[in-house]
Curated annotation (Swiss-Prot):
InterPro entries hit by this protein: CCDC171 (IPR038820)
Chain's gene name: Ccdc171
Organism (species): Mus musculus (Mouse)
Lineage: superkingdom: Eukaryota
Coiled coil: 29-296, 325-393, 453-521, 599-712, 981-1145
Record-given protein name: Coiled-coil domain-containing protein 171
Region of interest (Disordered), ranges: 1301-1324
Length: 1324
């Protein structure tokens, strides 16, 4: 039954399946058809959009090209304006050149006249100069005779001065010799002082007091000697000053004469300067003439350059015109090519969009990855640089620290040595002073103990304070002596200053008298100048006649000016006719009318008028050309509409063909779907079998998973335990390392200090041996006692000292034995860099302390080491002690301060616990040092040995049986011997003083001899005075001769005594001779100067005469100059009147120019204010009344200007009428274009409506609303075509180039892109 039912069911199922498959296929077909239709519509819309975009781009490019054409036209117009300006500048330059030429010719004529007058004056001046030279030669001969007399007097005085100088230099030589002897004595003292300090530092301070007292006495004696010598030198200086005063009187006479000569030379220089000034004026006039000639040539050259530039500009204009024509041809070629490019552009557009999208994605990915890689590389580089910098810094700091450590150690050792040496030296030095008696009485009670450092310092302070007080007294005395010397010098300088002031007063009185004489001369000059003034007045009357001639020339010039004005009037009439015929607006020249001459202005105006008429004709041609272009564009619009209709028909045919293809594809898809259903059923059976197998595998995996979970829990517990142990051990190791390293560093430092102290002890012993040897070498007494002591010492050594050595050796051996038994060490570690510093590593306490043989001991040692290294008790103690620290570590925050304090406290507690437990484990190694206890015990063996040694040493000292003499005795012996040396030195100094007294006696005898020499010199001076005075009698002369003979006898006796000093005086004489030779040279130069001065006086007199003549000539020239200036003023007044007339005309023209500017501004404002669609150029009306009211009362020039303005107004009205007609035509064109646009827009809307109706019919049977709505959304994409741009009118191009773009129409959809908006119309 079941089989039958299954067989009946299968055909029904198959039929249902077939029906379902058919329904599905139909649905798919309908869906595919609707999708295809929607896609096609979208493509259609896209094509239309692209077409619109192409048209907009085409319009945009056209507008850009047209704007370029407009720019080129503007540039051409600018070139023409520039040419006009250059022509205007050329005319101005010609005018200025003509004026300059006339002025230069007039200046040349004036300069020639002045040159002729100056030549005549020059000849007169030359004659006067010859007369002055003759008078100057006569005065020169007289002056030479006076100079010769004066030279004889000077030679006699110089001889006297030379003798005085020789004596003064001999005394100065003696003074230098005495100073040298003093310096030698002082040097000897210093040498002796250094020798004594090197030999005996200990007794230096004691001797210093005595020596300072002696030196002060010697210094005072030397000062007295020096003062005596200074007094002698001062007496000599006074004599020399007297001689110098005489010499100064002579020099004053010379100075007066030189001052007179200088005055004459100054006067001569003034005259020369005035003469040079006149010559310079003449030269300047000549240079001005030459400069004017050069300026004239330059103006000619500049005019030629301007003409060349104008030609170049004309050539450039022609080139630009040719380039414009080429540009127009290129534009037409580009338009043809653009149509061909549009077809290719549509094909390639799709490919480029896809490739651009892919490219953009790839570029974004590439840039993102590149940025990431660069950032990573930069971060790594920064990290590397930072690390390298830190490494270098750490290496440097490490090296510097090591160097500083070594230096500090060396410095510390050196300081310790120096400190000890200083203490010893201080002790030895202070022992020899009187202050040390108190110290020794207070300190040397215990002879065995050395003196303390504080006591030594106190004694030093006392001694130093005593010496400081004495030094201050000595320094105060020296200061007072220095102050006295300075006051003496100031007094001497004041005396000299008073003398100099008196001399200057006398000179001033003399100059006053001289100036009064000059005033009298000047009054005579004034009288002569008055006579010359009368002559000048006659000349002025002559120049009045010249002025009358100039006035007649001015009248002639005014007649020529009237003729020019008549010519200008005729030209203006012709210009008016041109303007009436042309009917063109003209721009005024830019504010330079007052520089033009009438002929030049007329030429420029005529050229401008011709150019403007030509521009008007060109503008008319352009308007006709633009109308032709508008017609062509309307034809192209019609053609585009036809092409669009053709494309729509083609698209409809393509849609029908695609519908037939879609039906075929629908049938094929139904067949494929049925085959796929059968394959799905087969695969479902296979997948059921695979699922059963997988369920069995899952059960097995679950059992294995449970086992793995158990193992994992076990491993986690073990791992947590090991982690705890590891952390505890790590903390313990860290704490132990922190404790061990500083202990080890301290032990190293202690070892180095121990070595250093050992070296110091050795050096101390060596120092003691040296002191003893010194004492033995110096004291060669009690040799027999020493020999007896040596024999007793040998016996003493053999009995006691040998026994003590044996006892100490036994004690050391027992201690070493005990240490070896108690210590359980593993090994000793030695640092490689620091040799000799070792570290002992021990094991825990051995349980049984029995004695074993050697081979068993080694085995036990290995077993103990192994048990200690792998002991569980030790691990337990470490973990138990570190539990508290582990708890704190787990809870700590690195940022909080409280946690830090808790962590340090926990570490401290755990370390204390660990050390307590380790001390109980390692009981064999004593942690606390017991050395201090053993040394402190009263009945210890070490203290007993020390007491015994002390007793033996005291007994040996009593009987003199000690092997080594104590240091205190040796130092006392040294002090005694040093005291003996000082006594000997004292005796030697007493002998030295006696020798000094002998030297002073010798010097006194020399001083007496000098006094006699002074007397002889005074007699010689008196003799010289008698010679100079003419009223000396014969009896006085004989008495003076007798006195001189007596003085000569005395001098002979003195020379017998002074033969020893003759050698030193010879050197001084040699120097004096050199000085005298120099003075002789100076005297010769003075004589030559006097001669030159006399010659200069003669020249000055001659030049005075020549200057007077020149002054007369100058007054005449000045009068001529005044007359010429008056003539120039008259001419300038006439020119000013003409300039005023020109300015009146120019002002009138400027007012007209301002009015025209206002009109231009109104035009531009009306353009900007106007709307975009209804723009019309409305020119403002200019009333003739405004210009007529501004009419000026003037000559024919003003009337001609007013006539020209009226003609301009007529032309302006004609132009405004023509422009209004053109604007009306443009408005009619605009209305036509607007109607065309509205028709186009309605046609496009109709097409869109037809497309929408077709779409609604196709989608009426379908149930998918989203796809049916798609074409409705895209309706807005179909837009009307835009109109192309209208061309601009050149006359108003500059004001409307940058206007805003127009919208196409008010009904355009919002989906249009911004690029599609173009300006509708630009221009008139």
């Amino acid at each position: 039954m079941s089989l039958n039912t299954s067989s009946n069911a299968t055909p029904g199922d198959t039929q249902r399946l077939k029906n379902a498959s058919l329904d599905v296929k139909q649905m798919l077909k309908n869906e595919t058809e609707s999708d295809i239709i929607a896609d096609l519509r979208k493509k259609l819309h896209r094509a239309k959009k692209e077409k619109l975009e192409m048209t907009t781009k085409h319009n945009a490019e056209l507008s850009s090209y047209e704007s370029q054409i407009a720019r080129l036209r503007s540039e051409v117009e600018k070139g023409e304006a520039l040419r006009q300006r250059l022509e205007y500048d050329l005319a101005v330059a010609r005018k200025e050149a003509g004026l300059g030429r006339r002025a230069a010719e007039e200046r040349l004529a004036e300069a020639q006249r002045i040159q002729e007058r100056l030549c005549a004056q020059n000849s007169e001046l030359q004659g006067k100069a010859n007369e002055i030279e003759k008078t100057f030669q006569i005065s020169q001969e007289k002056w030479r005779e006076e100079c010769r007399r004066f030279e004889h007097d000077l030679e006699e005085r110089d001889n006297i001065i030379q003798n005085c100088n020789q004596e003064y230099e001999s005394l100065m030589q003696e003074k230098t010799r005495l100073q040298k002897t003093l310096q030698e004595i002082l040097e000897k003292h210093e040498q002796e002082k250094t020798e004594l300090e090197s030999r005996v530092r200990e007794t230096a301070l004691g001797e210093f007091r005595l020596q300072t007292e002696e030196w002060e006495a010697e210094r005072r004696e030397l000062q007295l000697i020096v003062q005596e010598q200074d007094s002698a030198v001062q007496s000599m200086q006074k004599k020399v000053e007297q001689l110098e005063a005489e010499h100064m009187d002579c020099s004053d006479l010379l100075r007066r004469q030189t001052s007179e000569l200088e005055f004459s030379t100054q006067r001569e220089e003034r005259l020369r300067k005035e003469f040079e000034a006149t010559t310079l004026r003449v030269r300047k006039l000549e240079e001005n003439i030459e400069a004017e000639r050069a300026a004239h040539l330059e103006s000619k050259f500049n005019s030629e350059i301007i003409q060349l530039r104008i030609r170049d500009l004309e050539g450039a204009l022609q080139v630009e015109k040719a380039s414009q024509a080429e540009a127009v041809a290129d534009l037409e070629m580009i338009k043809n090519e653009f149509k061909e490019v549009e077809s290719a552009y549509e094909r390639e557009k799709q490919n480029t969009q896809e490739s651009c999208a892919k490219l953009n994605l790839l570029e974004r990915e590439y840039f993102s990855q590149n940025k990431k890689l660069n950032e990573e590389i930069e971060d790594q580089k920064k990290v590397i640089i930072d690390l390298s910098k830190r490494l270098q810094y750490n290496e440097k700091s490490c090296g510097e620290l090591q160097e500083e450590l070594v230096m500090a150690k060396k410095h510390q050792a050196f300081l310790v040595e120096t400190c000890e040496n200083n203490v010893r030296e201080l002790e030895s030095i202070l022992g020899s002073f009187s202050v040390s008696a108190q110290w020794t009485s207070g300190v040397h009670k215990d002879k065995d103990k050395p003196p303390s450092f504080s006591v030594v310092l106190e004694t030093l302070r006392r001694t130093l304070t005593d010496y400081q007080n004495k030094l201050e007294d000595a320094s105060n005395e020296e200061k007072t002596s220095n102050e006295l010397d300075s006051t003496k010098q100031k007094i001497e300088t004041h005396i000299k200053n008073t003398k100099e002031l008196q001399d200057k007063l006398t000179e001033v009185h003399k100059e006053l008298s001289h100036l009064r004489a000059k005033c009298a001369d000047r009054e005579a000059l004034i009288t002569s100048l008055k006579v010359e003034l009368q002559n000048v007045l006659h000349c002025w009357e002559k120049e009045k006649a010249c002025a009358a001639q100039c006035e007649s020339e001015l009248q002639k010039l005014s007649q020529a000016f009237q003729k020019d004005s008549e010519e200008k009037l005729t030209f203006l009439h012709t210009l008016y006719q041109h303007l009436v015929a042309g009917c063109v607006l003209i721009k005024q020249p830019e504010g330079m009318l007052d520089k033009f001459s009438w002929s030049e202005l007329c030429a420029v105006l005529q050229e401008n008028v011709d150019a403007l008429i030509a521009d008007l004709n060109r503008a008319n041609e352009k308007i006709s050309h633009l109308e032709y272009i508008c017609k062509n564009k309307s034809d192209t619009m019609r053609e585009l509409q036809q092409t669009q209709e053709d494309t729509f028909n083609k698209v409809a045919e393509q849609i029908k063909a695609q519908e037939s293809c879609w039906q075929k594809q629908k049938k094929e898809l139904e067949f494929q779907y049925s085959e796929l259903l059968l394959e799905v059923q087969r695969r479902a059976q296979k997948f059921q079998e695979i699922a059963e197998k997988n369920s069995e595998k899952l059960n097995r995996i679950e059992t294995s998973h449970e086992q793995l979970v158990r193992e994992n829990s076990h491993f986690k517990t073990t791992l947590s335990r090991t982690q705890r142990e590891q952390t505890c051990l790590l903390a313990a190791c860290a704490l132990m390392a922190g404790a061990l390293c500083p202990l080890y560093s301290r032990s190293c430092a202690l070892s180095t200090q121990r070595d250093f102290l050992q070296e110091q002890v050795n050096s101390l012993e060596l120092f003691k041996l040296e002191i003893r040897t010194l004492a033995q070498a110096l004291s060669a007494v009690d040799e027999k006692k020493q020999e007896e002591a040596k024999t007793k010492k040998k016996t003493f050594k053999g009995l006691v000292r040998v026994f003590r050595k044996g006892v100490i050796a036994i004690l050391a051996a027992n201690r070493l034995k005990l240490l070896g038994q108690s210590c359980a060490f593993l090994f000793t570690w030695m640092e490689s860099c620091k040799e000799g510093i070792g570290m002992l590593v021990c094991t825990g306490e051995p349980k049984d302390k029995r004695q074993f043989p050697k081979h068993q001991r080694e085995q036990l040692r290995c077993l103990q080491a192994l048990a200690w290294l792998t002991s569980s008790d030790l691990l337990g103690t470490v973990i138990s002690s570190m539990t508290e620290l582990q708890e704190v570590i787990s809870k700590t925050d690195p940022n909080s301060r409280i946690c830090g304090h808790l962590l340090i406290g926990a570490a401290k507690n755990s370390f204390a616990k660990l050390m307590d437990k380790l001390s109980s484990a390692m009981a064999s190694i004593p942690l606390h040092s017991s050395r201090s206890i053993t040394y402190v015990e009263k009945d210890s063996l070490v203290q007993r040995l020390a007491r015994g040694l002390h007793k033996v040493n005291t007994l040996a000292l009593k009987y003199g049986l000690c092997s080594h003499i104590p240091i205190m005795k040796s130092t006392a012996a040294l002090q005694k011997q040093i005291f003996g040396f000082t006594q000997r030195l004292h005796a030697a100094e007493v002998e030295r003083r006696s020798l000094r007294l002998e030297v002073t006696e010798y010097k006194r005898t020399v001083h007496e001899m000098k006094k006699e020499l002074d007397k002889s010199q005074s007699l010689q001076t008196q003799l010289n005075e008698f010679k100079h005075s003419k009223l000396i009698t014969h009896e006085k002369f004989e008495s003076a001769c007798e006195e001189l003979n007596n003085a000569l006898l005395r001098e002979q006796q003195a020379q017998m005594l002074l033969n020893e000093q003759a050698q030193q005086l010879q050197e001084l004489n040699y120097r004096l001779e050199l000085h005298s030779s120099e003075e002789a040279d100076k005297n010769q130069t003075l004589g030559e100067a006097v001669k030159s001065l006399s010659e200069a006086k003669m020249e000055l007199r001659r030049k005075d005469q020549s200057l007077r003549q020149l002054n007369r000539h100058l007054t005449q020239l000045e009068q001529d100059k005044r007359r010429l200036e008056e003539n120039i003023r008259d001419a300038e007044s006439a020119l000013r009147m003409a300039a005023k007339d020109k300015e009146c005309v120019a002002n009138h023209m400027r007012t007209i120019e301002n009015m025209l500017h206002k009109v231009r501004d109104q035009i531009s404002l009306s353009r900007t204010a106007a709307t975009r669609n209804d723009f019309t150029l409305q020119l403002p009306k200019l009333h003739l009344e405004t210009f007529a009211m501004e009419g000026l009362q003037g000559g024919p020039e003003v009337v001609a200007c007013q006539a020209m303005i009226k003609s301009f107004m007529d032309v302006y009205q004609l132009a405004s009428a023509r422009i209004s007609t053109l604007e009306k035509e443009m408005t009619s064109h605009r209305s036509h274009i607007a109607t065309l646009k509205s028709e186009l827009h309605t046609a496009c809307l109709r097409e869109n409506e037809s497309l929408q109706s077709m779409g609604s019919r196709d989608h009426s049977n379908l149930s998918v609303p989203s796809r049916a709505a798609a074409p409705m959304d895209t309706v807005g994409d179909l837009l009307p075509l835009q109109a192309e741009l209208d061309t601009t009118y050149t006359f108003l191009k500059e004001t409307f180039v940058n206007t805003a773009p127009h919208s196409l129409s008010s009904q355009s959809s919002p989906g249009v892109p911004t690029n599609a908006k173009r300006p509708s119309q630009i221009g008139l």
